């Protein structure tokens, strides 16, 4: 109607997109994030910054205190899986956020005739800033060498791909990667994990153009060396993270507006504190 497809029509025309947009079901310590992921996916696919997403962010990421309230309820992937002795191999898809849970669930379902079943699904948190170099350490420590990194959604997100190419490409990448891993690991207990997610909404909004900081990850992070003369003040726009090395302070964007320049059109991003950047899936398959 009015140029729009019904869900049934979408299922017939583009089933992978239908399953990506399906309802997010997982074990989560704060269930609003599941509804948020569904709203995020709609905004991403329609390429519009919706009021639903905006209102969630203005409420849940109003400032660093509100952000801490919900993010502190979630454990990291390493914490959730550190006591597990039953996982035989890990698939790490760089940049795979919790928004991908329904789509991967469907791919596993398609392999049920081969004996694969999705046993458990959890939502975990990445560490802030949501960068690969900060979060990959835990993944490597957790997997004990039983790790395959494949289907990189991160690297390609930093290239400009015209809408809707990035939606189409990433669906294809996740399907091929998951299918290949299942086929190559018959009879094994598998955990699909990630280091951080990706947001495709920051490209739709302006940047705050904060002065005196070094831009990192297209302004999702502003870097302040401790020896810098730039003073760091509290602000509702970002969370202040002092790194353990005591050499750097990072300002991490709480909202979709980046802290420095605007994220280029057609580009995904991470580093900040939005739920799609921060929350990652743990999917246990046997």
Spans of features found by a protein language model:
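Feature captures the catalytic ectodomains and active-site-proximal regions of enzymes
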Residues: 1-286
């Amino acid at each position: 109607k009015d140029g729009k497809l019904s869900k049934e029509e979408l299922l017939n025309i583009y089933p992978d997109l239908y399953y990506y947009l399906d309802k997010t079901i997982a074990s989560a310590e704060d269930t609003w994030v599941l509804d948020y992921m569904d709203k995020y996916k709609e905004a991403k696919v329609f390429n519009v910054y919706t009021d639903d997403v905006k209102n969630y962010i203005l409420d849940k990421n109003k400032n660093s205190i509100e952000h801490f309230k919900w993010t502190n309820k979630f454990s990291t992937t390493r914490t959730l899986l550190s006591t597990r002795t039953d996982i035989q191999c890990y698939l790490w898809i760089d940049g795979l956020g919790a928004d991908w849970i329904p789509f991967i669930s469907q791919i596993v379902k398609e392999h049920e005739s081969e004996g694969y079943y999705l046993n458990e699904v959890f939502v975990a948190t990445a560490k802030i800033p949501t960068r690969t170099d900060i979060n990959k350490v835990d993944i490597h420590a957790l997997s004990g060498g039983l790790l395959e990194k494949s289907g990189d959604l991160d690297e390609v997100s930093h290239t400009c791909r015209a809408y809707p190419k990035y939606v189409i490409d990433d669906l294809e990448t996740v399907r091929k990667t998951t299918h290949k891993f299942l086929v190559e690991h018959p009879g094994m207990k598998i955990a699909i994990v990630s280091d951080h997610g990706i947001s495709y909404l920051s490209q739709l909004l302006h940047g705050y153009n904060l002065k005196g900081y070094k831009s990192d990850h297209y302004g999702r992070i502003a870097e302040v060396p401790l020896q810098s003369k730039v003073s760091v003040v509290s602000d509702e726009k970002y969370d202040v993270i002092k790194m353990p090395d005591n050499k750097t302070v990072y300002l991490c964007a709480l909202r979709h507006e980046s802290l420095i320049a605007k994220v280029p059109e057609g580009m995904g991003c991470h580093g900040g504190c939005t739920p799609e950047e921060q929350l990652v899936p743990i999917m246990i398959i046997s």
